[in-house]
Amino acid sequence: MCKNDATTNEKKPNQLTHRVMVGNVPLGGDAPVVVQSMLNAPANDVDANLAQIRELAAAGCEVVRMAIPRRDCLDAFQRVCEQSPLPVVADVHFDAQIAVEAARRGAAKLRINPGNIGGLAKTDAVLDAAGEVGIPIRIGVNAGSLDQDLAARRDLTLPQKLAASAAGYVEYCEGRGFHDLVVSAKAHDVMTTVRTYRQLSRDLPHIPLHIGITEAGTQFQGVVKSASGLGILLEEGIGDTMRISLTDDPVVEMRACWALLSALDLRRRGPEIISCPTCGRCQVNLIELAKQVESNLMSTTKPIKVAVMGCVVNGPGEARDADIGVACGAGVGVVFKHGEVQRKVEEHAIVDVLMEEIGKL
């Protein structure tokens, strides 16, 4: 993605990041922001992981990450890679040999933290293994694994320390001839994360960045925190791939990712529901009506705008840019397309008629 001047809200593309391939998915350069998630099924359960991958793929996931906590999980990882419809990233901590084996067993990318993988000699083995099979590596750093000398420096802020740590590892890898790198430096605090990625974008303008707010929390708080931080970064042109990390079903992460990208007009997938917050003029159960429409459209991938309005004040006038919508009155709804009234229906039939008309688009 284009890196922009982080000091202004104006879009000012400076330089494209280096493109890497994660399986058949391009990441970086002029490629669109890649949406990804992480499996949370037991690492040894092949069927459960594959079922989750299929659900994620149907929800718009493009790359999926799988933790390999022990060497006895490698066989399961290989079987998942062989059958997965999505590229699978191996997430490895503490044991470099697992990363080496994962590269040989079908990983589309490796995710390591050089600070806990066992030192530079073991990092070398991982670089060699990835280089042999031609897959990229994501270097993920965090405050807990900073070099002690770097962590102790009082002249640097935490974002500067995280960026310096990542830059040091990038320099080392590139010095050994390995260039297919992606970098992340996530924190659970929104503005620490934003400042860190701004620093990374300045220090490593050629490196694709994986952005996210780590340990963001449960659905409501996690989506708010992630949208706040990632929205800032994406608007500034920072970020080549993203994950919204939630303590929830990973499929919920996909809905949040695509909603954010759509809100920023970066990518679109599936419908956008436009609905008013209701007021004393509303004479139908609009809250339930909007929820029904949203639920019925959950599996729709068509990028359309659907308006569900509580009265004639808000629709079709204020929702004129919607592809289709309904403006409700006393027990009735007026269905409109692009601001033009199509038909009037009873309240009990609004959802069915709206779905019927959407099917014609």
Stretch-by-stretch model annotation:
Residues 30-48, 67-69, 86-94, 115, ...:
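Active-site mouth loops of central-metabolism enzymes
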